[in-house]
């Protein structure tokens, strides 16, 4: 009989980005929580690129922050370069991104977990989940001991039956140099969960001292830089002050020689040599994948990103590969600035087990077993931010399950986390899932600037934001509404096309005026608080478009039964992405509703289809 060591409300398996947010959320809600890890020193490890955020991803980090999560605070404290992406486009598609000091990020997260009340770190491998009457009751570890629990969150990342590929070399592991987890796959087979194989990869790490930086383009950070957490100083803002010290990244490009080396050795890669059967991420392809799929492209952009302030390692973003190591050296040295580069760690691909997310409710609890939750790469997603967003929801709902309370659901119209979870649990995945703003039909509303306004109420209700924090948000919200009403009530005369017309000050925001313009040209006061000022301007600009978006979404729902002609030529439809065309040709949906439920078919694709069919203007 196994020895029962302890009893927990929630057990989290894994200490990556999903596991951290799940464990912290559950513990902060008052659940006695255990985090089981293979190595307590790698909690929060960045397996691939040393960065947080990106298109849509940065918005997710701010949503996690609004729910009381940790990722935003961690990157604000350990980031070494900060940028706002898509600044040439509207606010609705802008997102923050930051380079991280990888070692400091990991140390920060480990310290937070170690000091969190109700959270206990266990360096043991969970090899089995104990179930009675379709309800989780405990876990069993590789040491043969058992822990009782009411809920389990599985966040194994790439570690479940992970296999690393470098050329024709196959190495069992969850990350290069680290063991994989094996026992849990047997548990899932025993309970008839389908298991599929997905694949991802990472580039080599380069010795900074062997790079010729004079041959590279400099890519600096923004000034002022954006921050991720509303609670990082200065509190109540999404911006750092000007003058924050940052490091540079650099840009280089592949060459025809690079492409020749890759083509000559394609048969030696794990992917094209037939060793890897798992499906890789469409939007983060290996360099060999790019060369095959875009044969006419003369060069591919590469970002060289420092891995930290106290290391010589450089991450070459855009050069992941599973080529043999000797070919990797030749390939990297064919790139300007890298002619004499030395590789510290080789690039590799990794294949791992995934349970299809259609096995889950939108709460991230499995349909087969009560109290069993999944989050992160194990659900078929790719990316730290996607993992963390699922992790905080799974952790919250695991704690609520342990307390016998109703779960939470995040809706598509209130968060990108809600968009992601809805996509995963209703459409499933045929390849690793990555978030983009185009996946949301509500992107004019669920922006990076208003995450705290959208989700702070829920964060407070769950006990993950303090009363003081929520009070500040409500005060700012009242200020925003007060200024909006004021500007809507004030009218000014403006010359347009030779005519002078009267407009409300609010309407001017939709005509590319700023509040500073209003102050300078018409003498109106503007809000002193920087966040209030920014938010008033953005909300007034977007309000009419958000209403139009809402009406369009209502119309789209009514058009779901529209028939699609069997002989339709998807190549002739303007506005469809390559992925959308491929998926529509493959699945041949007979109605627009069926098309909308295919993995990878975005609301934008459905709109383009309906316009082509003459159902929308």
Swiss-Prot record:
PROSITE patterns: GIDA_1, GIDA_2. FAD binds at residues 14-19, 126, 181, 377. Its cofactor is FAD. It comes from the Bacteria. Coiled coil: none annotated. Its main location: cytoplasm. GO terms for molecular function: flavin adenine dinucleotide binding. Gene3D superfamilies: FAD/NAD(P)-binding domain, GidA associated domain, C-terminal subdomain, tRNA uridine 5-carboxymethylaminomethyl modification enzyme MnmG/GidA. NAD-binding protein involved in the addition of a carboxymethylaminomethyl (cmnm) group at the wobble position (U34) of certain tRNAs, forming tRNA-cmnm(5)s(2)U34. Homodimer. Heterotetramer of two MnmE and two MnmG subunits. This is tRNA uridine 5-carboxymethylaminomethyl modification enzyme MnmG. It comes from Aquifex aeolicus (strain VF5). The gene is mnmG.
């Amino acid at each position: 009989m196994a020895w029962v060591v302890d009893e927990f409300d929630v057990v989290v398996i894994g200490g990556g980005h999903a596991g951290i947010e799940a464990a912290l959320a559950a513990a902060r809600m008052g659940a006695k929580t255990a985090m089981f890890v293979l190595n307590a020193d790698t909690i929060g490890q960045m397996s691939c690129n040393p960065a947080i955020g990106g298109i849509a991803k940065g918005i997710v980090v701010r949503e996690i922050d609004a729910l009381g999560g940790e990722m935003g605070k961690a990157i604000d404290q350990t980031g070494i370069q900060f940028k706002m992406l898509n600044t040439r486009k509207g606010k609705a598609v802008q997102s923050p991104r930051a380079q991280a000091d990888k070692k400091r990020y990991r140390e920060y997260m480990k310290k937070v977990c170690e000091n969190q009340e109700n959270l206990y770190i266990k360096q043991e491998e969970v090899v089995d989940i104990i179930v009675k009457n379709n309800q989780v009751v405990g876990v069993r570890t590789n040491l043969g001991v058992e822990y009782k629990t009411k809920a389990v969150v599985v966040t194994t990342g790439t570690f479940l039956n992970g296999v690393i590929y470098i050329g024709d070399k196959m190495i069992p592991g969850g990350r290069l140099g680290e063991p994989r987890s094996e026992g849990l796959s047997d548990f899932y087979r025993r309970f008839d969960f389908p298991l599929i194989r997905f694949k991802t990869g990472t580039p080599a790490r380069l010795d900074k001292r062997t790079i010729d930086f004079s041959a590279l383009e400099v890519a600096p950070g923004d000034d002022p830089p954006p921050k991720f957490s509303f609670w990082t100083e200065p509190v109540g803002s999404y911006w750092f002050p000007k003058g924050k010290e940052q490091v540079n990244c650099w840009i280089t490009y592949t060459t025809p020689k690079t492409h020749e080396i890759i083509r000559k050795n394609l048969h030696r890669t794990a992917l094209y040599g037939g060793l890897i059967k798992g499906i890789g991420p469409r939007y983060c392809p290996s360099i060999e994948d790019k060369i095959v799929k875009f044969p006419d492209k003369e060069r591919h952009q590469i970002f060289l990103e420092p891995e930290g302030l106290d290391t010589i390692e450089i991450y070459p973003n855009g050069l992941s590969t599973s080529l043999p190591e000797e070919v990797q050296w030749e390939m990297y040295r064919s790139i300007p600035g890298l002619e004499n580069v030395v590789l510290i760690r080789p690039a590799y691909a990794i294949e791992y087990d995934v349970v299809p997310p259609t096995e889950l409710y939108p709460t991230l609890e499995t349909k087969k077993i009560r109290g069993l939750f999944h989050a992160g790469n194990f659900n078929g997603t790719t990316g730290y931010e996607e993992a963390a967003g699922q992790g905080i929801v799974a952790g919250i709902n695991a704690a609520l399950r342990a307390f016998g309370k109703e779960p939470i659901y995040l809706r598509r119209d209130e968060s990108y986390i809600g968009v992601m979870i809805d996509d995963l649990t209703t459409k499933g995945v045929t390849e690793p899932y990555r978030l983009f703003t185009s996946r949301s039909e509500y992107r004019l509303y669920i922006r990076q600037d208003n995450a705290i306004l959208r989700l702070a109420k829920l964060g407070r209700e769950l006990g993950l934001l303090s009363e003081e924090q929520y009070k500040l948000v409500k005060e700012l919200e009242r200020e925003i509404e007060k200024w909006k009403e004021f500007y809507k009530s004030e009218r000014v005369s403006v010359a347009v096309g030779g005519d002078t017309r009267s407009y409300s000050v609010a309407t001017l925001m939709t005509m590319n005026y700023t509040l500073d313009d209003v102050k300078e040209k018409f003498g109106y006061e503007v809000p002193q608080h920087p966040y209030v000022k920014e938010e008033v301007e953005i909300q007034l600009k977007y309000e009419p478009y958000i209403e139009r978006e809402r009406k369009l979404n209502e119309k789209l729902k009514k058009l779901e039964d529209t028939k699609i002609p069997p002989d339709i030529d998807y190549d002739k439809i303007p506005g469809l992405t390559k992925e959308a065309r491929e998926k529509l040709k493959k699945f041949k949906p007979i109605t627009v509703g069926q098309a909308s439920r295919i993995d990878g078919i975005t609301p934008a694709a459905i709109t383009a289809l309906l316009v082509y069919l003459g159902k929308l203007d």
